[in-house]
């Protein structure tokens, strides 16, 4: 049987992602990072992100096809992130992908960004139901995955996303952007941690909150306390918070399988904490934690294999799109 090739594109925020998947296996995963561009501003500037996507995307698609030894007409499916995300950035990749699908007369799949993250951590052959934690710079959501395309939101952040909190604390500490890897690196230098309170202990639900940790970090920075110990304390509290909420949900639902996806999933201390939790835990392969196009191609391939119909080309991109409605 002839192989099925899927092109996936993600421009939901500040990374231009292009991936190629062959029969559910990632063959090419290219990401054009805008970190240096936005670093001076301490965060993503939406208009600049959109302009950079316009520059990078055509070249990245051309390079991906060349690396796989493919011509555009060899593609079987084209997919792109429809949302959620920065609408200007989303439109660049989404419109480009729809144009390719139309020109090549190929099926087009509009993919939810968070379903892409879940697909990246979802091993082939793992049956649902299970829990999925998506923790990144823009999202911190805990889902019960009932099946492909069937998700139940258990809890979400009440304020900052986990990755956003890492970025903001990194800025307070005078570190680079994105802040997650920088805080992790600095925390590893500390022998002792300055204690931080773990948020929402004793709550009945499964929500998250990171704004209090950020405020605590600000007060400690103003006191001139050691930065490495501060970073370690913040990271330990943030990870403990994520773990406690997830473990409570696992106990209440009876699920023993957990997927951890999104950029924060690359944090080594977080990985160790969840591995010690007594659950069967799955993380994305190296390179698939951050935003990328390969995860979008994976999600589209799985939908295609399961008989989900392609998306109409008339369907527009959207900044707000609950995963439960995808």
From Swiss-Prot:
CC terms in the record's Gene Ontology section: cytoplasm
Enzyme class name: transferase
Keyword Manganese: no
EC annotation from Swiss-Prot or TrEMBL: 2.3.1.234
Chief site of localization: cytoplasm
Annotated CDD domains: ASKHA_NBD_TsaD_bac
Residues where Fe cation binds: 113, 117, 291
Positions of substrate binding: 134-138, 167, 180, 267
Catalytic activity reported: L-threonylcarbamoyladenylate + adenosine(37) in tRNA = N(6)-L-threonylcarbamoyladenosine(37) in tRNA + AMP + H(+)
Keywords, alphabetical: Acyltransferase, Cytoplasm, Iron, Metal-binding, Transferase, tRNA processing
Cofactor: Fe(2+)
Listed NCBIfam families: gcp_kae1, T6A_TsaD_YgjD
Family in the record: Belongs to the KAE1 / TsaD family.
Function comment: Required for the formation of a threonylcarbamoyl group on adenosine at position 37 (t(6)A37) in tRNAs that read codons beginning with adenine. Is involved in the transfer of the threonylcarbamoyl moiety of threonylcarbamoyl-AMP (TC-AMP) to the N6 group of A37, together with TsaE and TsaB. TsaD likely plays a direct catalytic role in this reaction.
Entry protein name: tRNA N6-adenosine threonylcarbamoyltransferase
Organism of derivation: Thermus thermophilus (strain ATCC 27634 / DSM 579 / HB8)
């Amino acid at each position: 049987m002839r192989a099925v090739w899927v092109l996936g594109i993600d421009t939901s925020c500040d990374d231009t992602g292009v991936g190629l998947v062959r029969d559910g296996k990632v063959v090419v995963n290219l990401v054009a990072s805008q970190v240096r561009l936005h670093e001076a501003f301490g965060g993503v500037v939406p208009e600049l992100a959109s302009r950079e996507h316009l520059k990078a995307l055509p070249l990245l698609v051309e390079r991906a096809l060349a690396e796989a030894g493919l011509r555009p007409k060899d593609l079987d499916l084209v997919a792109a992130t429809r949302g959620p995300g920065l609408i200007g950035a989303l439109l660049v990749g989404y419109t480009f992908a729809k144009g390719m699908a139309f020109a090549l007369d190929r099926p087009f799949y509009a993919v939810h960004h968070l379903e892409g993250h879940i697909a990246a951590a979802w091993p082939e052959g793992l049956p649902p139901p299970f829990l999925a934690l998506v923790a990144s710079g823009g999202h911190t959501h805990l889902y019960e995955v009932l099946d492909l395309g069937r998700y139940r939101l258990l809890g979400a952040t009440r304020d900052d996303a986990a990755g956003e909190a890492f970025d903001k604390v990194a800025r307070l500490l005078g570190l680079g952007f994105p802040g997650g890897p920088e805080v992790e690196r600095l925390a590893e230098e500390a022998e002792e941690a300055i204690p931080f309170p773990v948020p929402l202990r004793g709550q009945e639900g499964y929500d998250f909150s990171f704004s209090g940790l950020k405020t605590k970090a600000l007060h400690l920075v103003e006191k001139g306390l050691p930065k490495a110990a501060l970073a370690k304390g913040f990271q330990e509290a943030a990870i403990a918070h994520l773990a406690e909420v997830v473990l409570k949900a696992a106990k209440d639902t009876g699920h023993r399988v957990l997927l951890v996806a999104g950029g924060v999933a690359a944090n080594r201390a977080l990985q160790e904490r969840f591995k010690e939790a007594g659950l069967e835990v799955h993380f994305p392969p190296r390179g698939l934690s951050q935003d990328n196009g390969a995860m979008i191609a994976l999600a589209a391939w799985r939908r295609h294999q399961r008989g989900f119909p392609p998306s109409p080309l008339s369907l527009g991109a959207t900044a707000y799109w609950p995963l439960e409605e995808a």
